[in-house]
Amino acid sequence: MLKLYNTLSKTKEDFKSINPGKVGMYVCGPTVYDHCHLGHGRGYVAMDILRRYLEYSGLEVRHIMNYTDVGHLVDNAEVGEDKIEKKAKIEKIDPLVIADKYIESAEEDFVALNIKPANFKPRPTRYIAQIIAFVEMLIQKSYAYEVDGSVYFSVEKFPEYGKLSGRNTEDLISGSRVEINPDKRNPLDFAVWIKAPKEHLLKWNSPWGVGYPGWHIECSAMSYDLLGQDTFDIHGGGNENKFPHNENEIAQSEAILGKPMANFWTLWNMVTVDGVKMSKSLNNFTTIKDALKKYDPAVIRLWVISSHYRSIIGYSGKALEQAKENLRKISDWVSNLKDLAAAKSDSSSEIDFTHIYKKRFEEAMDDDLNTPIALAVIYELITETNRLLAENKLSVATAKNILGYWEKINKVFGLIIEAKGEIPAGIQKIGEERKMARDSKDFPKSDELRDRLAELGYAIEDLKDNNYSIKKK
């Protein structure tokens, strides 16, 4: 049975879904004001592995991942500009155009990294009615109060506040660096609806005046709407957002539900550069697109799953080169097996030893998704297979058996091993979109997609008869 580490209980627990055979999973997605970096990539690959292993285990997953397109302020302490509006002013375009642009960019990254698309990808700007209704319920239950057009959640009304992050309210108040907002009854109270100044671009009418939602209320309202207005199985996200974001989500949602928001809190750890967290604020980040110019998407994915999702990953050229070498080892192994499997049947008997590796693979994955150990099992299988190949002791039937086993477990790893010269499906999709743009004479869009291909390390050439060719640079 799968055991998952639950950040809420701080222990590994047996995973049992609320509804037999089905899993509800909500993952906090990126704030879309720039291209995703490898820290984002690490997290969403980790959640993809979780989803894939649940599906491998026979469960149907209802996967929600939002895109935050309003309400995430530059400072988490509810001061400063909205991150998307700030970028919109720099680029002198509408903030929703900014959001659209970077959602499209994120989708390209996720396709390249072979991350399965979520079943639903809600955006707060399209859920304003549901968010307002959620805030109204909080007010009706006396968990929130309105002051001069803004609405605040009353932390003292929720005695369990701090249970996810392990913080208590007294320490939070004494350690607060935030100037006290006179509108708040308690310094820890946080905004669920924010009064919009005249210059604010994204704003909506509400029972409390013109404003916009706070960052934290968005996830509570959208998960409530899309996961049955009840407790759901798994909430995923980055460990750095445990406080205040996830903590505030719990307070809001459990105030309405009167029971747990989610049974499991599965949080991934950060990526570091020279021991320092990779982040946009420190300008020490590498975008997924820049990394893809140097490395095959499967190399990046293998680099991620070579570490446990709860451990810190150090980003370096050395680490990526090691992943590249390991992918080459896997690729050569698969290629050799395919060559043998394609041969005519021989007289050698089939040796079925994959069940041993299958058991060990599942034991590793059942232990809180221990992908490093699961990969080590595969590397051992590669070594054993190569020994048998070298000694001419591997039959065609055995090769086919091993290939079949690899295909099953690679549905969990999600490593796309391209044949030499083969263009990934995600790159082909962009090529088709560019062709459609050219056919409709949308040349600015065509040029934009050509530039995107270049960013991803591919060149496109227009040929006769309205065809095209894509090549790796």
Name these PLM-found stretches.
Residues 59, 143, 458:
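Short phosphate-binding/catalytic loops that engage adenosine nucleotides
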